[in-house]
Every structure is written in structure tokens, then in C-alpha cells.
């Protein structure tokens, strides 16, 4: 357990989570990547955890340690080749960009100071901590809630209903979250979602034993959880660019280490808190018996009442019987609070935190300043500045040329071995490449036309809306827009001035430390 949580999971999770912020600086692409990354981690795993596992596996696994270890071993082995795919087919563009311009090694102490003195990152890490408390305890308590409050032990259906019906929005959200985030902003949409989480938790907590009310509340709560689940990593990545603008160096590694430490540590803490609640409330674990007669004797000896008539229980895979016990009211109240009620409070607190996360508003200006600094540093070293996107195209072209040369050498060797005409086979290959390039060019042309048409429709729609205004309404609208722009410009100037002070201070500290070495 310690080897997995302390080392293996921490190393993998931190590195995997870093791929979103390091893949691109484009905030729009990064947001979309975050959504699809979370789709993979939430939806695909959800299909197994929410549907197949409780319905097909859990009733037959019981509480046998041998069976559980066997199942987990198979899952771990299946994960390995998939992790290799991620390793070989991903690219850290931001890291490569930094490597070409940043020569000063940033001390770990400076990164710690940068992260914990930045308001936006502190707010996001606080959100991560509080939301992880709620989600970890909820996840840990789900089996107990489905087994003892809403259903019976390993009935194979209660947990499926909770996950499928209550979690249906997680599937719908793929198509809704990103368009809404582009329209209203990632942080603003997340605040609204967290308020829905609190409302849904309250609805469920009112009647924790009523299946219909609980499913309604869970449906509302999961709608509210969509922005946080799908967009948090995109906002976290935006904050890394913000911090780079503010300090002159990236602290992604340390910030992500803190994030991973929170997530991993709270798994153990959540288990400890759950066990403390269960122990204090008088929880009685299920019993394992070799036969129903033995189970009946154990129940009679302790004065316990089974959840169902003993005749209804079926043997597990190892031939034993796992019997669920009726719990006390105190135990069921404790379980209901951890599964349903806790996120009422964590949702409200997190909404309050996110209300002050304004990293998106000036991100474009900050990224432009970062690029100007990189250009200046590059030219100061006597090098020719090449924009990252152009350099990426050049590197991609070189990689394709090298791959083509390798293919032709392999083709020639294969033709010599099989007695084929190399020139004929090469002409076939060249024709295939030409057709492929033409299709790709046509695809890009159509995508460009579609984007231009979409932008034109949006512009025409806005123009038509403004045209409907009376002269007085238009005057007020223009005045309101000018006032908003002036307010935003003034806020940016204040932030920029403060950021420049911190940037100069951080750079001076780095220069002093570099001089001492």
C-alpha cells in the first residue's frame, strides 16, 4: 500500500497531470485537452467502476483478500502497455520552449516561495484540498452507503443506479462544458457548478433512504461537478503561465507535486476519517461463514440481525458466504453525512474560493510578455529568435524527412530480400504520400473555412443584436462597454506594475544566487 501510494501512484499521477499544462500554451487548446483528458479518466473508468464492477464482479468477490488482490493485479498489468503509449506519443512543448531560453537553474526554495506567495495558486491548491476531502470521503463511503442505507450488502444494483443515473451528467457534459466555458469563462462556470453541487447534496441529504430523491440530488450534484472535473486542470495550467510571467521561471514541478501530495495523502486521511466515523458510530462489518448454518450461529451468538433472510444469500467465488448486518441509526446517519451531506459544505467553501480566481482575464497579455522576454533573452545570447510554433513546424518537418529516409532504406532492403523492383515500389509509396497530403490539406482548408464562417456568423449575430437597439440604448451600451474596458485596463495596469516588481525581485535573487555559485 505504501509503495503504491507513496511512490508509484505519486510519480505517475504527477507526471501524467503535468502533460496538460506542458503540451501547449494555447489556453483554448489546453482547455479542450483538459476536458478530453478528464473524459478518459472519469467516463472510461466510470464504465467499469460504476457498471461492470458492482454488477458483475463485486457480488461474487465478497471480502476475500485473495480474490481482490488477483483482480487488482490483472488491472495493473493491463495498465502498463497503455502507460507506454502515453510516454512515446506525447510532447512537452512548453518544457522544450523553456529549455531553449532559460539557462539559470531555479533553486527549489525559490519555487516554493513563488507558489505559496501567489494568490491564484494558493486559492487553487486550497480548492484542491477542500474538494478532495469531500470527494475522497464520498468515494470511500459509497460502498457503505449503497450497502447499508440505500440498499443491501453487495446487492449488485444499488451502486449501479447511483453511478449510472446520478452520474449521467458526466457523459452529457463532454458536449456542454467546453462551449459553456468559452462563453462564460472557466472559473465563472466552475463557481456556478459548485453551487449546484451544494444544492444537489442538500436535496439528497434531506431523504437519504429515498431512492428517487437521492438520485435526483445526485443528478443535480453531478451536473454541478462537471466544470470542476473537466476544467480544473486547464485553470491550473493557466496559473502556471501566470506564475511564469510574475517570476520569470516556471514552477510547474513543485506546484504539481503539492497537488499530487494533496490527492494521495487525502486517500489515506479519508480512509482514517471514515474508519473513525464508523468505529465511533458502532459499525458492524459483514461476517464470513463457511455455511449458512455457521452464519446463523454467529448472528445468534452476537445478537445481530442480517439485512436479508439467510436463504437469499449466495456463496462467493471461494465458496464462503458474506452476510451483511443491519446497522444502527447512528451508523447510517454517519454514513449519510459523509456520502451526501459533507459536499454541501465543501461545495459552498470551494465556490467562495473560486470566485477570486481571475487568471483567465489577462492571460493573453501575460503570455505575450513571456514571449517578448524569451525573444529578448535569445537575442542577448546572439541567437536568432524563432517563434515556438514555427520552430515546432520546422522540427516536425525534419522528423518527417528523417522518417521518410528511414522508410526508403527499409523499403530498399525489403525489395532486395523479396526480389521486388525498388523503383516501382517507391513510386507507389510516393503516390500514397501525395494522396495523403492532399487529403490533409483539404481537411485543413475546410476547417479554416468552417472557422471563418463560424466567426462571421457570431459577428453578424452581434451586429444584428446591436442594430435593434435604439440610439439611446446604443449610446448607453457603448458607454457601459467603454467603462468596463477602462476598468479592466486600470486593473491590468495595477496587476502589471505589481507583477513587474515581483519579477525584478525574483530575477535579482536568482542572479545573486547564481553569482555565489
Predicted regions: what they are:
Residues 1-390, 412, 419:
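Membrane-embedded alpha-helical bundles of multi-pass transporters/translocases
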Residues 304, 309-329, 358-517:
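Intrinsic disorder in cytosolic terminal tails and internal cytosolic loops
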Amino acid at each position: 500500500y505504501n509503495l503504491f501510494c507513496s511512490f508509484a501512484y505519486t510519480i505517475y499521477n504527477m507526471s501524467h497531470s503535468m502533460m496538460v499544462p506542458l503540451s501547449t500554451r494555447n489556453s483554448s487548446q489546453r482547455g479542450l485537452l483538459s476536458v478530453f483528458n478528464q473524459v478518459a479518466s472519469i467516463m472510461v473508468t466510470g464504465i467499469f467502476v460504476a457498471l461492470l464492477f458492482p454488477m458483475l464482479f463485486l457480488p461474487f468477490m465478497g471480502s476475500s483478500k485473495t480474490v481482490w488482490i488477483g483482480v487488482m493485479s490483472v488491472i495493473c498489468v493491463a495498465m502498463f502497455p497503455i502507460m507506454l503509449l502515453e510516454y512515446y506519443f506525447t510532447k512537452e512543448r512548453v518544457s522544450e520552449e523553456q529549455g531553449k531560453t532559460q539557462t539559470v537553474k531555479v533553486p527549489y526554495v525559490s519555487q516554493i516561495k513563488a507558489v505559496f506567495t501567489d494568490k491564484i495558486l494558493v486559492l487553487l491548491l486550497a480548492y484542491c484540498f477542500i474538494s478532495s476531502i469531500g470527494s475522497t470521503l464520498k468515494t470511500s463511503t459509497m460502498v457503505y452507503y449503497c450497502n447499508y442505507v440505500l440498499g443491501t450488502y453487495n446487492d449488485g444494483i444499488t451502486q449501479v443506479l447511483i453511478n449510472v443515473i446520478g452520474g449521467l451528467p458526466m457523459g452529457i457534459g463532454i458536449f456542454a462544458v467546453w462551449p459553456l466555458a468559452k462563453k462564460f469563462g472557466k472559473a465563472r462556470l466552475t463557481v456556478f457548478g459548485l453551487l449546484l453541487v451544494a444544492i444537489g447534496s442538500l436535496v439528497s441529504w434531506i431523504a437519504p433512504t429515498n431512492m428517487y430523491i437521492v438520485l435526483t440530488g445526485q443528478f443535480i450534484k453531478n451536473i454541478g461537478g462537471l466544470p470542476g472535473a473537466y476544467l480544473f486542470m486547464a485553470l491550473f495550467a493557466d496559473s502556471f503561465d501566470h506564475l511564469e510571467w510574475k517570476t520569470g521561471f516556471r514552477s510547474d514541478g513543485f506546484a504539481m507535486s503539492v497537488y499530487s501530495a494533496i490527492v494521495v495523502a487525502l486517500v489515506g486521511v479519508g480512509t482514517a476519517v471514515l474508519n473513525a466515523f464508523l468505529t465511533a458510530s458502532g459499525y458492524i462489518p459483514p461476517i464470513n461463514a463457511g455455511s449458512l448454518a455457521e452464519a446463523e450461529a454467529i448472528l445468534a451468538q452476537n445478537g445481530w440481525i442480517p439485512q436479508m433472510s439467510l436463504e437469499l444469500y449466495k456463496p462467493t467465488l471461494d465458496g464462503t458466504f458474506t452476510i451483511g448486518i443491519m446497522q444502527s441509526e447512528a451508523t447510517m446517519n454517519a454514513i449519510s453525512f459523509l456520502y451526501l451531506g459533507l459536499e454541501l459544505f465543501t461545495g459552498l467553501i470551494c465556490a467562495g474560493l473560486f470566485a477570486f480566481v481571475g487568471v483567465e482575464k489577462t492571460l493573453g497579455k501575460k503570455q505575450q510578455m513571456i514571449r517578448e522576454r524569451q525573444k529578448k533573452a535569445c537575442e542577448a545570447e546572439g541567437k536568432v529568435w524563432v517563434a515556438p510554433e514555427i520552430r515546432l513546424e520546422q522540427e516536425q518537418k525534419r522528423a518527417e524527412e528523417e522518417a521518410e529516409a528511414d522508410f526508403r532504406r527499409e523499403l530498399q532492403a525489403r525489395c532486395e530480400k523479396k526480389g521486388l523492383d525498388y523503383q516501382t515500389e517507391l513510386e507507389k509509396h510516393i503516390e500514397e504520400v501525395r494522396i495523403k497530403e492532399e487529403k490533409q490539406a483539404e481537411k485543413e482548408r475546410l476547417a479554416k473555412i468552417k472557422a471563418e464562417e463560424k466567426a462571421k456568423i457570431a459577428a453578424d449575430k452581434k451586429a444584428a443584436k446591436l442594430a435593434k437597439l435604439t440610439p439611446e440604448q446604443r449610446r448607453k451600451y457603448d458607454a457601459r462597454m467603454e467603462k468596463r474596458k477602462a476598468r479592466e485596463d486600470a486593473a491590468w495596469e495595477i496587476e502589471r506594475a505589481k507583477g513587474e516588481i515581483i519579477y525584478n525581485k525574483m530575477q535579482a535573487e536568482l542572479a545573486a544566487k547564481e553569482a555565489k555559485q
